[in-house]
Design a protein with these regions (language model features):
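The short coil/loop that forms the "turn" connecting the two helices of the helix-turn-helix
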Residues: 25, 36-37
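C-terminal regulatory/effector modules of DNA-binding transcriptional regulators
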Residues: 180-281
């Protein structure tokens, strides 16, 4: 049995289908634009095959899709420029990881919730290394070091990109002694520093006192939204290297509502900062 098509293909293909249907085009009409048979269009729309940037632009232009939305889809469908951080870590970045990395780099807004761990984008190298060392498997010390370096490159690229990032962090993550007390203390201090230095980053702590909440039972949630493309989005449950992707508009809307409820249940950014500073002392 074959697996599901890659999430980036599903996201782009689903968008193409919606745009085509919105203007009343049939598969045959789209096929005439690319001078191909209708089966190729069908496979593209269902994510069974990819599409070249030139062909993607041709379809999007014919469908009347605004330029900003076109650019977002082309970025999602591509593999990034030569300077993209993931090209330096081919042995670490799996196909699944690459899908997420490319979508993350194209996103204009990232929303993340973690119950027990500090999210990847906010971790120190020491914290990341402690997690890597605890994972099952037979990775060598060098491979773990490379994984930490890849994560650091990813953080630098994403945090330095000016995109909005909203994080809701379970209070338990501030007490889970990943790597020991010293590593945890350094990690909390790093959160305080990031909060002060990154104006596009908002950190909120979901306190133990919040009780049951909109993400109860979910350990990890990330939502990506894209510039000038209100109909595009991806919700991801689980680790970057695996997990489940949901890209339908209904699913993304449901998780956006859940994240809004999480934010409402969490401490305000100011109160969260005070908690972090108190723990960092």
């Amino acid at each position: 049995m074959t697996g599901d098509p890659p999430v980036r293909r599903r996201l782009v293909g689903g968008a193409l289908r919606r745009y085509r249907e919105a203007i009343g085009y049939m598969l045959e009409d789209a096929a005439r634009i690319l001078e191909c048979d209708r089966s190729k269009i069908s496979r593209i729309e269902t994510g069974q095959r990819g599409i070249r940037p030139k062909e993607l632009r041709e379809l999007l232009t014919e469908y009347g899709v605004p330029a900003g939305e076109q650019s977002a889809l082309v970025a999602i469908a591509g593999r990034g420029g030569r300077s993209s951080w993931w090209h330096s870590y081919p042995g670490i970045v799996t196909d699944t990881y690459l899908d997420y990395a490319i979508m993350e780099s194209a996103a204009s807004e990232i929303m993340a919730y973690e119950a027990q761990l500090v999210p990847d984008l906010l971790q120190t190298d020491e914290y990341t290394g402690a997690i890597a060392a605890a994972e099952p498997g037979d990775r060598t010390g060098q491979q773990r070091d490379d994984a930490v370096a890849a994560q650091a490159a990813r953080r630098q690229a994403v945090l330095g990109g000016g995109r909005r990032i909203g994080v809701v962090l379970g209070e338990g993550a501030l007490h889970q002694a990943v790597g020991g007390a010293g590593v945890l203390a350094g990690q909390i201090g790093h959160l305080v520093k990031l909060s002060a230095e990154c104006p596009a980053l908002t950190i909120q702590v979901l306190p133990f006192s919040a009780g049951a909440h909109a993400a109860a039972g979910a350990g990890s949630l990330a939502i990506l939204r894209f510039p000038d493309a209100p109909g595009l989005g991806v919700a991801h449950l689980g680790a970057v290297s695996g997990g489940v992707y949901l890209e339908s508009q209904d699913d993304v809307s449901r998780y956006l509502r859940a994240f809004a409820l999480l934010r409402a249940s969490a401490l305000s950014p100011a109160d969260s900062d005070r908690m972090l500073r108190g723990l960092a002392r």
